[in-house]
Amino acid sequence: MGTWILFACLLGAAFAMPLPPHPGSPGYINLSYEKSHSQAINTDRTALVLTPLKWYQSMIRQPYPSYGYEPMGGWLHHQIIPVLSQQHPPSHTLQPHHHLPVVPAQQPVAPQQPMMPVPGHHSMTPTQHHQPNIPPSAQQPFQQPFQPQAIPPQSHQPMQPQSPLHPMQPLAPQPPLPPLFSMQPLSPILPELPLEAWPATDKTKREEVD
């Protein structure tokens, strides 16, 4: 019995011992053995603690020099600056470079104003509150210079009829059209199919019976 007990104790100790440091997997630390084992095991445990941290830090630090952390932040800031300039009026120099993206981005805001009062005035009030808070003066100066120009009016005119006028007008004729279209094909299809099918089935059945 003593040998079996010793064997079980050794197995338990072997499974409970911390694993050696491995580059792929962080070690499993058991704090209960901190007092009972010698400094060597403690050093192994500390190595287990440090190696995963170092490996994790190395994994984090490697991509930044390769991608360039500072230029990345600068690129993000540069990308955000034109977006802010589109909303704010002072920077007019970047607007001519981004006529195409700026016009579609701001025009949907303008057609929303005529669209919102049609369904309900309550939805119009929050848009008014949000617009003066963020770009109240931005939309006015943008619309003023766009009107004299030739490119914005062309793209601004199709946007207005597409959003408020066209979707509202076809909605009225659409409901009557589907029932008329569905009734017309149903009337000729129903009589044609049975007339063609019955005589064929009758002939085959008669031949088989005969």
UniProtKB/Swiss-Prot annotation:
GO biological process, one term: response to calcium ion
Domain of life where this protein originates: Eukaryota
Annotated stretches, region: Disordered: 109-187
Chief location bin: secreted
Bias (Pro residues): 170-179
InterPro entries attached to this UniProt entry: Amelogenin
Record key words, sorted: Biomineralization, Extracellular matrix, Phosphoprotein, Repeat, Secreted, Signal
Family: Belongs to the amelogenin family.
Protein name: Amelogenin, X isoform
